[in-house]
Amino acid sequence: MDNNLIGARATVYGLFASLYMNGGIERDYEAIIKVLSAISSEPFTDEAKEFSDLMIDRLQNDKNGVLYEFEVLFNLPFGDFINSSASYYHDEREFGEKTISTKEIMHDAGYIKADFYSSGEDEFGMLCAVSSKLLIEQKTILQKKLFDIVLKPTVAGFVDAQLKSERAEFYKSTASLLALFIAFEKSYFEFYG
């Protein structure tokens, strides 16, 4: 397999990890802009360019608004709250089967979640971070397993929740880009197995 393609996939997973983890946008702002700019310059679909351009514009012109939107959508457990646990979209509860599957894959990779990280292992930001790390460390079989068992069956519910949210603006573009990337990943695994 092409190492450049694997590296690009790891980078895009890292982008989504930063966008869906608490503090990720503030911590990784420059890298987020850089990756979105790269996607805009060399999009994997025409729509990817459109969504990455919208995201760059919003981040550069209203970063505080994006941070507020993240808090409202993913951290305030009332109103337009969007659950970011894969188990929620599978078992209709947090810390379910997908949490166990993710813990098993992380164990097989030799990863231990830090105690100071309060979110579950199956939160979409964490799933993207683990996917990125697995690809960087060339643990592609485990990354495919994580994709097949946890991400692929649950991500549509997470994306739909963002697209249907009346309070999401930036995260509608983010969810759309995530959906395009997941479609790319499905095709990638069909081609490379």
Which sequence ranges carry the predicted segments?
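Surface/interface-facing alpha-helical segments and adjacent flexible terminal/loop regions used
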Residues: M1-G193
